[in-house]
Design a protein with these regions (language model features):
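C-terminal catalytic/motor cores of large multi-domain enzyme assemblies
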Residues: 1-123
């Protein structure tokens, strides 16, 4: 799995650009070993294959892995009316030697807020 290092010091744009470059090199089988070393958090997305929900296994040395499922349109209630809405299943597996379950839950709550209201990421 390609690793984007020092993401806390990069903008969303820089992370996006680097992710695209690493994905292209991975597809072309041109990744270097150093580009796959040192991960702490992994994102596994099977949603693009129509998989709605799954549980990933943490690859060491990562502390967590986030499983991202497909976006599915379902009826939701908004302002008292039933309307079409998009839902997506996320699952977070944490190594409890390094990440407490409550910390993982807080992360998922924050991520949910960001996904439902993307502008909050910029504030």
């Amino acid at each position: 799995v390609p690793v984007i290092k020092f993401t806390d010091q990069k903008s969303f744009s820089q992370i996006s650009t680097e992710a695209k470059e690493l994905a292209k090199r991975a597809k072309d089988k041109k990744l270097q070993p150093a580009e796959m070393d040192g991960n702490t958090f992994t994102v596994s997305n099977l949603g693009m294959f129509g998989i709605e929900s799954f549980t990933s296994i943490i690859n060491m040395p990562a502390s967590c892995i986030l499983s991202v499922g497909a976006i599915k349109q379902v009826p939701v209630v908004k302002n008292g009316a039933v309307v079409p809405g998009n839902t997506m299943m996320l699952s977070l597996a944490c190594d409890h030697r390094t990440v407490d379950g409550a910390t993982g839950a807080a992360f998922l709550q924050t991520l949910k807020t960001f996904i439902e209201n993307p502008v909050t990421m910029l504030v």
